[in-house]
From Swiss-Prot:
Source organism per UniProt: Drosophila melanogaster
Cellular location(s): Nucleus
Full protein name: Mediator of RNA polymerase II transcription subunit 11
PANTHER family on file: MEDIATOR OF RNA POLYMERASE II TRANSCRIPTION SUBUNIT 11
Keywords tagged on the record: Activator, Nucleus, Transcription, Transcription regulation
Length: 176
């Protein structure tokens, strides 16, 4: 049953309640007469009880339907259970999205920290490499200086034996 049918069913129940009340009123009128007919009073009373029983069963049916709807139990012609499942699915999706967003933020924080640490390590490695290059250059300069000094000593030592003259001439040749 669709919602429109449910509304029509409730309208019918309302009409039966009105008939039930009219039957009760007619039965009371019959009993209130000075010359009341017991047969008419019984007929009206039976009609009242019959319509009351019908109203009670139809109202119970509607109450059962509303109980099913309100507790989310599946029932004929209702989209409530499907709507509830859909709503819960949307809720789960929203929760999953927020959790993914949190994880992405955490990842971004950690990857940023990792990039900074990697940058510091690279800078440190570059500084060490530069320092090693400077040390190598200093060692090369020292080796070159030592080689130059050794060469000067070797060339300077050979000149010292030939005389004190800066030109390297022989002192015995200078006397006449």
């Amino acid at each position: 049953m669709n919602p429109l049918d449910k509304i029509h069913a409730l309208d019918e129940i309302e009409k039966e309640i009105i008939l039930c009340m009219q039957s009760a009123g007619q039965a009371l009128q019959e009993l209130g007469k000075e010359k009341s007919s017991q047969k008419n009073a019984e007929t009206q009373s039976q009609q009242f009880l019959k319509s009351l029983s019908s109203v009670e069963s139809k109202l119970s049916e509607q109450i059962n339907y509303l109980t099913q709807v309100s507790t989310g139990q599946p029932h004929e012609g209702s989209g409530y259970a499907s709507a509830k499942v859909l709503q819960m699915a949307w809720h789960r999706i929203q929760h999953a999205r927020s959790r993914v967003r949190e994880l992405e933020e955490t990842k971004a924080k950690h990857s940023h920290a990792a990039r900074q640490q990697l940058k510091r390590q690279q800078e440190h490695a570059a500084a060490q490499q530069q320092q090693q290059q400077q040390q190598q250059q200093q060692q090369q300069q020292q080796q070159m200086q030592q080689a130059a000094q050794q060469q000067q000593q070797q060339t300077g030592g050979g000149n010292a034996g030939s005389g004190d003259h800066p030109m390297g001439g022989d002192s015995s040749m200078s006397t006449n």
